[in-house]
Structures are given as structure tokens and as C-alpha cells.
Regions:
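Cyclophilin-like peptidyl-prolyl cis-trans isomerases
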Residues: 2-229
């Protein structure tokens, strides 16, 4: 397992390829309760760029604006319990579309969360089929939804290796955490925060730093299901 800096849930990645497939789609306003306004007021470009590594490669998403706008919840069944989160499709359409693509292609099945932090920051990092912290899906895409981003307990956000290097790795925040707004938030846990806190209470092997390592209670994904809301 690669050594990671303790202050941020980053992942190590190799260089990216330069070919880009981009799609421009309407970005919708949301009300205070998260309901999308019908009138598009801006556009957002979803660019999924072929990249290495390509672990458990499932292809590269072809952005579908209609599908991306559909609200959904993701239910992640793990060996430690079930976690459900509501995807922020209006605020992070490129990220939520990518996550849905990977989930619907069984990308996460039988993978496990490889990093738990219990000091300074409080996250459980998942989404790498190699379980090393250096794996990726074979493509990357830019950051979004960072303006004013905060990371309270229950946040689901992307891990990265620097600006605009998102892939498949993501993290759950199991306790309110202060991070710079550099990690795309794309969901909120609606059930299973207790599962995350149980895993956190089990501690880690601290192989990276004290309170930062491989979780002792390893959550392996049995499956990840997408449900329309």
C-alpha cells in the first residue's frame, strides 16, 4: 500500500493520457431543498479523459445529459453493513454520472476500502479495485462543486492526486472534518453512518501514519445498487 499524506485523502496516480471526450450539458439551478429548476442557466462540460492506471477496466463513460439529471441513491452492501447515500446529481453531474456508470458495470463489487483515518481528518477511502490506493478506472475527469465545499459527517467526496484528477476513488466522512475545498462532494449518507463509525471505532494498522492506515474492520463491497429517486 502506498504511503499517503495524513492531511488529505489523496491517491497516487500515474500520468494521464491526453485524449479527451467532452460533452456540454445544461447545469440546473437548485432550490434550498435541492429541487432542480427547469430553466438551464449555464453549461457544464463533462470530460472523461483516458488515463492510466486502468484497473478492472469497464470502458469510458459517454455522457448522457438526460440520465445524468435523474436523481438517484446508491446502496453499498459491504461485509460490515449497508451504506446508502443520496447522489448530488444537480451539483456534481459529471461525478455522479461517473459513479453511476461504474456501479452499473459492477466496478466496485468485491473491492474493499483500503484507508481509514482517525486523527486530524476522519475519512474512509474506497473505490480502488487493487486495494492499494494507486488504482483507477482508466479515465479521469475534472473537479466540480468545490465553491464553499465543506465536509461534515456523512459527506461522500472524491479522492484525488491533485486538481482535476478524479477517477474511481472516493471517501466517506464519518465525523465532521476540516479539509480545504479541493475534493468534489457528490453525495450525502442517508443510512449507514453507524456502519462507518463502527469501522472507524475498529481502528487501523497505522501503516501510513498514526491513525492512518488499513482498516482493521475491512469493508468489502458485495454490490453497489443504483435506485432512482
Amino acid at each position: 500500500m502506498s504511503i499517503h499524506p495524513p492531511e488529505a485523502p489523496q491517491v497516487l496516480r500515474k500520468h494521464w493520457a491526453l485524449l479527451t471526450a467532452a460533452t456540454t450539458v445544461p447545469l440546473l439551478l437548485t432550490t434550498s431543498v435541492g429541487v432542480a429548476d427547469a430553466a438551464p442557466v449555464a453549461t457544464v462540460t463533462c470530460a472523461y479523459t483516458p488515463a492510466v492506471p486502468a484497473d478492472n477496466f469497464k470502458g469510458i463513460p459517454v455522457f448522457d445529459a438526460k440520465k445524468a439529471a435523474q436523481p438517484y441513491s446508491a446502496t453499498l452492501k459491504t461485509t460490515q453493513g449497508t451504506i446508502t447515500f443520496k447522489a448530488s446529481t444537480a451539483q456534481a453531474p459529471c461525478t455522479t454520472f461517473s459513479f453511476r456508470f461504474l456501479a452499473e458495470h459492477d466496478y466496485f463489487d468485491r473491492s474493499h476500502c483500503h484507508r481509514l483515518t482517525t486523527e486530524r481528518i476522519f475519512v474512509l477511502q474506497c473505490g480502488d479495485p487493487t486495494g492499494t490506493g494507486s488504482g483507477g478506472p482508466g479515465y479521469s475527469f475534472p473537479d466540480e462543486n468545490l465553491t464553499g465545499a465543506t465536509y461534515p459527517a456523512g459527506t461522500v467526496a472524491m479522492a484525488n492526486a491533485g486538481p482535476n484528477t478524479n477517477g474511481s476513488q472516493f471517501f466517506f466522512v464519518w465525523k465532521d472534518t476540516k479539509l480545504s475545498p479541493a475534493y468534489t462532494p457528490f453525495g450525502q449518507v442517508t443510512a449507514g453512518l453507524d456502519v462507518l463509525q463502527k469501522i472507524a471505532a475498529g481502528g487501523s494498522d497505522s501503516q501510513n501514519n498514526p491513525g492512518d492506515g488499513y482498516p482493521n474492520l475491512v469493508p468489502t463491497f458485495k454490490n453497489v445498487k443504483i435506485t432512482k429517486r
